[in-house]
Amino acid sequence: MASELAMSGSDLPTSPLAMEYVNDFDLMKFEVKKEPVETDRIISQCGRLIAGGSLSSTPMSTPCSSVPPSPSFSAPSPGSGTDQKTHLEDYYWMTGYPQQLNPEALGFSPEDAVEALINSSHHPLPGAFDGYARGQQLAAAAGGSVPAEEMGSAAAVVSAVIAAAAAQGGAPHYHHHHHHPHHGGGGGGGGHPHGAAPGSAPPSSASSSAAGSGGGGGGGGGGAGGLHHPHHGGGGGGGGLHFDDRFSDEQLVTMSMRELNRQLRGVSKEEVIRLKQKRRTLKNRGYAQSCRFKRVQQRHVLESEKNQLLQQVEHLKQEISRLVRERDAYKEKYEKLVSNGFRENGSSSDNPSSPEFFMYPRESSTTVM
């Protein structure tokens, strides 16, 4: 394919503007369909018949309308009348894509031509071959003022731009971004800013953005739906912040339900439900905290009482041990006195000789525990 393009380099358009448009696209990546010479002749005849008005202008399932052949920079087809007709027949394949008029024949600027290309690629015309017929009529009408070489170069530029846009699939997305530039460039597609005119971009940047925005255009289109109404979700949030500032947590808890309902007159139902839920949550939290505090306080009281009781028990134990020691001492003393008294009296008499005798039974009766 590269050798064929190199051989036909002499037939390429020589206009600087046309070459600038063509250089913006990598023509080597587009596949060129190889067709026999006999098929080219049949297709050329079919194009001449359609241009003459002998066939219907709507596309039909014919060999010349189903698959448009690839652009050829070959010699003029036999039987053509003028050079302008020859150039238009060489590029009649472009009618398979969304049609455009010749911008130079209508006096369009290059920016207007690119804008028309983009708009027409998004809204194609109903007739597939109407553009070719109108192009011939306009070429015949403007034949005296527009040279044939410029007509051919303009057709080549238009065909190259349409082919690149169709291959990249970026023309519809670019059109969407052009009509809705405020949707944002989040997806990467090139859209004009608010203050820029649609045709103010340079021709090279406009054509490159038309061809290269296919990858990011989808993302931008998807993000446009989410950015259409960013203020709807913020309205409720603003009201919520306002009421949160108006009622503090302490006021919500201490305020009666009747007073709260009076304060919330005219407020949306969602906001009322949210504030009441917040009030219920705060009251439950306060109730749980108070219960926890009471439990902790009661535990501290019980622990203090327990410590006091333990101290009393220890004191009582100490008293018991002291009393036991006293008892043991008195018992030992009693036993000594009893043994000493019986030894002194011995067998002298049965009557007691001293008053200690009367003390022993009484002391023994009181000390027995």
Curated annotation (Swiss-Prot):
Residues 274-337 form the bZIP domain. This protein is synthesized as an Env-Maf polyprotein. It comes from the Viruses. CDD domains: bZIP_Maf_large. It is found in: Host nucleus. SUPFAM superfamilies: A DNA-binding domain in eukaryotic transcription factors (SSF47454), Leucine zipper domain (SSF57959). Residues 274-299 are annotated as: Basic motif. Belongs to the bZIP family. Maf subfamily. Keywords: DNA-binding, Host nucleus, Oncogene, Transcription, Transcription regulation. Residues 184-193, 212-226 have a biased composition (Gly residues). One of its GO terms (cellular component) is host cell nucleus. Might be a transcriptional trans-activator. Residues 345-354 have a biased composition (Polar residues). InterPro entries: bZIP, bZIP_Maf, bZIP_sf, Maf_TF_N, TF_DNA-bd_sf, Transcription_factor_Maf_fam. Residues 302-323 are annotated as: Leucine-zipper. This is Transforming protein Maf. GO terms for molecular function: DNA-binding transcription factor activity, RNA polymerase II-specific; RNA polymerase II cis-regulatory region sequence-specific DNA binding. Residues 57-85, 169-243, 341-369 are annotated as: Disordered. Gene3D superfamilies: 1.20.5.170. Residues 194-211 have a biased composition (Low complexity). Residues 173-183 have a biased composition (Basic residues).
